[in-house]
Amino acid sequence: MARYTGPATRKSRRLRVDLVGGDANFERRPYPPGQAGRARIKESEYLLQLQEKQKARFTYGIMEKQFRRYYAEAHRRPGKTGDNLMVLLESRLDNVVYRAGLARTRRQARQLVSHGHFTVNGKKVNVPSFQVSQYDIIDVREKSRKMVWFDEAQEALADAVVPAWLQVVPSTLRILVHQLPERAQIEVPIQEQLIVEFYSK
């Protein structure tokens, strides 16, 4: 599946949000490319909604067609569509690996999952979009644990801040999904109601 692989900082500046996490270049220049020193142009309601959708897509590394499927599923489920959408995005396996501190970025987490380094409930899963469920157990495969990266990740877990809905066992690199996240537990600068308004037109 094709994905945006261009300069992450440029995309972050255009959408005014750090899509990478800890991007020093974005912190220095948080305004859109080509707008240095210019007053912000008043944006239309449609443009704001579109930007919010793009922000969510690029934050989680999802193409438009797949994102539409997420929205359709969120709309089908009971409850608030926006909340459901954010829970679906946050429950992707690659995002869980990132949230647990086993990858520096979601892009790296996606690569680690795609290369088959993880199991879910004892079964190998190499699909980044795999939806985790409550009580799932995610492990690094035995042969993968010998990789230098996982040695470094294991050391870094001592300082990792893990969301309350997850638990990480540093000694085994095991991730426990105690529950699916609630919207209040998802710390991303996305106004999902604007996305709902975008697709409701």
UniProtKB/Swiss-Prot annotation:
One of its GO terms (molecular function) is rRNA binding. It comes from Corynebacterium kroppenstedtii (strain DSM 44385 / JCM 11950 / CIP 105744 / CCUG 35717). Part of the 30S ribosomal subunit. Contacts protein S5. The interaction surface between S4 and S5 is involved in control of translational fidelity. SUPFAM superfamilies: Alpha-L RNA-binding motif. The lineage of its organism: Bacteria, Bacillati, Actinomycetota, Actinomycetes, Mycobacteriales. One of its GO terms (biological process) is ribosomal small subunit biogenesis. This is Small ribosomal subunit protein uS4. PANTHER family: 30S 40S RIBOSOMAL PROTEIN (PTHR11831), SMALL RIBOSOMAL SUBUNIT PROTEIN US4M (PTHR11831:SF4). One of its GO terms (cellular component) is small ribosomal subunit. Belongs to the universal ribosomal protein uS4 family. The keyword Ribonucleoprotein applies.
